[in-house]
Amino acid sequence: MLLAIEGIDGAGKGTLCGELLALAEAAGVRAAALSFPRYEETRFSELVGAYLRGDMGAIDQVPVRYAALLFGGDRFESRGKLMTLIADHD
């Protein structure tokens, strides 16, 4: 099973994920978490970091489609890790 949790910064995604992992473990379910962007783990995530730091200009001046490409590229580069986690967990 793949479960995606999305929300703005500070919304409690990490807390919810931790609670779900604890519940899964208590139930004997093999579970894992993967967080995006995967800062410094993929080339695209390095670019996401540069974008968020403002290294590419003010965030409101960077085309939204370009920013979306960076975030999507990070997920694409992470597909091998994601597929391994899916195969190795319940």
Feature names for model-found ranges:
Residues 11:
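ATP-binding Walker
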Residues 8:
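P-loop (Walker A) phosphate-binding loop of NTP-binding proteins
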Residues 29-90:
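ATP-dependent small-molecule kinase phosphotransfer cores
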